């Protein structure tokens, strides 16, 4: 362990020294810059919490980017991040709960499960509970309180890691207003779904503040046979306070403190439905899931210090600390007899309910489980339902700083950025099983397990990241070059289920170290006043885990278990595109090609695995595709009627080049496609605004999806059929303070399948209508 720590400290100190040299050199150049050059410098003001800041910035990057503006979010009144992202080309999502509470997001064909292969940020800070040691965790910032969402892909994302293959998503929270503002945004509707979002804030010369509270709850659209619904409740409280100087000359300082608390209590489950039950009653919940409940608590603290010497030179430093607790108490397996072999997981039962009929009858409450033993020592050997407490604690903390330097040298515009981050995160698993008997469709506790008897380990990561990005513009050409460095040290301490008190007598330690140099290069050229071309190439990277096991299958189907140090995910990613931007018409067409030398998968319970989260080597793979978006406003800006139109389309083709076997994916044969990646997605939005009234319609088409690796025609039991969903919204602005809203989702009340995982079939949200008000005082 001392060597593990000393190596890390040596690299950290060397990079801090290198960063200091860059900063000193930049500052010296900035001091020498002439005043008239400063006055001619065009500066786009972007807050410290944003990476794009506007649609204009997104359209003028050397790589692919999309900015979901506050106006765009307000159009449809969405609270579901899946629906917010539907218009963004290159994004694949598949639903799980119907409300976007735990989204599965893929960017350019990365694995979608638990959004584990994207860099997720809130206000530019890593938002996942443990992005290095356990990226597939059950936390996603509440989309209902965000004022903007930023998506960067391709060579646009070298500053944002550790995941650089697909892209990054930055959730931009409510900012401190420029003047006094109090706002209420409340909706109520189908299934007693309530959203109440209130915020108040103000800004003076030397300070500003903002406080907001979000309450989001619903009875849910799934119900038990007794018509009892299974819903959720969420609370979110955020406060920001900033102090600053306001000099007209010289350096200015500001410090902003952000504190947040969020919780959730939901009756969510992993238990889906059988094929036949889904066809009859798609919104049914089996009584065997009546005890399933997810409880989460999240705390965040962020301090942001901004030092701005001039419009050309500024430094931004963030100190952050996040904690996340979650206990998903959910049905794991069913036991029919007293023998260990008479036990089946819920995935096995629902995949073949006929063969596992005795287990399914207990799960569905058709028959009671028997009790053979009454003494405490043997209670756990009884038949019944085993409910697992997936009890976990996470923390992440770190400090990151960046320096930005802009200048004009003759006909050249130069924009340099250097960044450095030191980060630590940890996942603590301490899980157990409880045994319940089924009697008269009610679950009764028989035996309570010992904490730590199912999983009992701590995984920690220390990471040092540094990057440099330089953009040079000369006449019609812009060249962006970047370099990122990641040094990661992982350590897993498995106390084993035999040492639930964690005495350390049976502790197993496994470690792994990863280093990566990640270059990127992007070009942007203005072919004419309205037409531009761009291209980029960059290295994709994803941190490894500590697992060292790999199962390889030969041509005859024989499995060989290999022991090796797990390598990081690595790929070479290429993109090229064209942009057209006229007054009322804008379009973009991009082709991308991601060539993996080593793709990583994860053993997720959400994908039918054992839930260890251990990563496994998939090996070589290719993901390629095309992204298209077009925006058109037929009428001039000063016309009383506006009818904005937007069309986006994504084509994605995936292929794994190796044969292997895993807990999550089973047997994979070379040529198989990656599961849960849409080959075709299309989104169309149509709006109409006249005077104080506004109407918007969104149409989303999702092509057929493969739920397990395979090739050729998709088998019916491994398929999510294609579907088209219509959403709509209407607004009436009564006066400058009050606006009335009506939002609908799934306007045609279509019953559609969204997932066959974690266990069984799941339906998307049925028709929902929600009336609301937006009231502002300023």
PLM regions and their residue ranges:
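Transmembrane beta-barrel wall of Gram-negative outer-membrane proteins
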Residues: 181, 188-217, 225-269, 293-310, ...
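Extracytoplasmic beta-strand/coil segments of soluble accessory domains associated
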Residues: 82-129
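Short acidic/polar hinge/loop motifs at secondary-structure boundaries
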Residues: 125-153
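Membrane-embedded beta-barrel scaffold of Gram-negative outer-membrane proteins
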Residues: 308, 314-320, 324-328, 526, ...
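N-terminal periplasmic "start-of-domain" segments of outer-membrane beta-barrel proteins
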Residues: 43-76, 101-104
């Amino acid at each position: 362990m001392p060597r593990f720590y000393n190596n890390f400290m040596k690299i950290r100190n060397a990079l801090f020294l290198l960063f200091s040299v860059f900063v000193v050199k930049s500052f010296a150049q900035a001091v020498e810059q002439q005043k008239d050059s400063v006055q001619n410098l065009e500066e786009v003001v972007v807050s410290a919490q944003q990476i794009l800041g506007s649609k204009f910035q997104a359209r003028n990057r050397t790589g692919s980017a999309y900015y979901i503006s506050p106006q765009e979010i307000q159009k449809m009144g969405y609270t579901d991040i899946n629906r917010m992202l539907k218009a963004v080309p290159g994004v694949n999502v598949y639903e799980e709960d119907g409300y976007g509470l735990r989204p599965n997001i893929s960017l350019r064909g990365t694995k979608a499960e638990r959004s584990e292969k994207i860099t997720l940020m809130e206000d530019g800070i890593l938002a996942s509970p443990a992005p290095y040691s356990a990226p597939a965790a059950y936390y996603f910032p509440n989309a209902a309180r965000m004022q903007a969402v930023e998506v960067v892909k391709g060579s646009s994302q070298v500053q944002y890691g550790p995941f650089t293959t697909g892209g990054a998503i930055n959730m931009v929270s409510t900012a401190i207003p420029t003047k006094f503002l109090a706002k209420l945004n409340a909706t109520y509707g189908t299934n007693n779904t309530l959203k109440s979002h209130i915020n108040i804030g103000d800004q003076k010369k030397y300070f500003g503040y903002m406080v907001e509270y979000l309450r989001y709850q619903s009875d849910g659209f799934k119900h038990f046979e007794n018509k009892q619904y299974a819903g959720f409740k969420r609370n979110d409280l955020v406060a920001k306070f900033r102090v600053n100087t306001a000099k007209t000359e010289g350096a200015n300082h500001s410090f902003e403190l952000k504190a947040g608390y969020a919780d959730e209590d939901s009756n969510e489950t992993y238990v889906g439905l059988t094929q036949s039950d889904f066809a009859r009653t798609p919104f049914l919940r089996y009584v065997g899931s009546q005890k399933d409940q997810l409880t989460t608590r999240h705390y965040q603290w962020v301090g942001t210090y901004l030092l701005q010497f001039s419009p050309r030179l500024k430094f931004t430093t963030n100190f952050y600390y996040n904690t996340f607790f979650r206990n998903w108490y959910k049905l794991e397996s069913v036991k029919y007899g007293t023998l260990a072999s008479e036990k089946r997981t819920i995935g096995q039962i629902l995949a073949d309910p006929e063969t596992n009929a005795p287990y399914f009858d207990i799960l569905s409450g058709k028959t009671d489980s028997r009790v053979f033993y009454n003494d405490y020592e043997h209670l756990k050997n009884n038949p019944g339902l085993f409910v697992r407490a997936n009890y976990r604690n996470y923390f992440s903390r770190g400090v990151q700083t960046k320096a930005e330097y802009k200048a004009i040298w003759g006909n050249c515009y130069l924009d340099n950025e250097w960044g450095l981050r030191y980060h630590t995160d940890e996942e603590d698993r301490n899980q157990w099983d409880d045994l319940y008997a089924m009697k008269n469709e009610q679950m009764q506790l028989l035996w309570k397990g010992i904490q730590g008897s199912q999983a009992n380990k701590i995984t920690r990561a220390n990471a040092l990241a540094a990057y440099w990005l330089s953009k040079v513009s000369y006449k019609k050409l812009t060249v962006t070059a970047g370099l990122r460095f990641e040094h990661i040290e992982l350590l897993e301490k498995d106390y084993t289920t035999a040492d639930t008190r964690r005495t350390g007598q049976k502790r197993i330690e496994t470690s792994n170290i990863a280093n990566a140099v990640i270059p990127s290069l992007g070009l942007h050229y203005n072919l004419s006043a309205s037409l531009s071309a761009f291209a980029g190439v960059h290295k994709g990277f994803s941190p490894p885990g500590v697992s060292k096991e790999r199962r390889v299958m030969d041509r005859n189907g024989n499995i060989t278990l290999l022991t090796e140090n797990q390598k990081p995910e690595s790929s070479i990613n290429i993109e090229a595109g064209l942009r057209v931007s006229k007054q009322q018409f804008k379009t973009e067409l991009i082709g991308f090609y991601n060539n993996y030398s080593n793709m990583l998968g994860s053993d997720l319970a959400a994908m039918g695995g054992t839930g260890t989260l251990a990563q496994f080597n998939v090996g070589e793979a290719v993901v390629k595709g095309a992204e298209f978006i077009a925006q058109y406003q037929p009428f001039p800006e000063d016309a009383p009627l506006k009818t904005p139109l937007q069309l986006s389309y994504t084509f994605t083709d995936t292929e794994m080049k190796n044969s292997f076997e895993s807990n999550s994916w089973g047997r994979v044969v070379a040529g198989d496609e990656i599961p849960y990646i849409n080959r075709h997605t299309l989104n169309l939005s149509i709006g109409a605004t006249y005077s104080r009234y506004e109407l918007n319609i969104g149409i989303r088409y999702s092509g057929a999806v493969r739920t397990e690796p395979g090739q050729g025609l998709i088998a019916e039991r491994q398929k999510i059929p294609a579907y088209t969903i219509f959403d709509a919204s209407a607004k009436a602005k009564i006066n400058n303070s009050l606006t009335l809203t009506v939002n609908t989702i799934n306007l045609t009340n279509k019953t559609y399948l969204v997932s066959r995982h974690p266990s069984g079939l799941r339906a998307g949200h049925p028709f929902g209508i929600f009336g609301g008000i937006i009231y502002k005082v300023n």
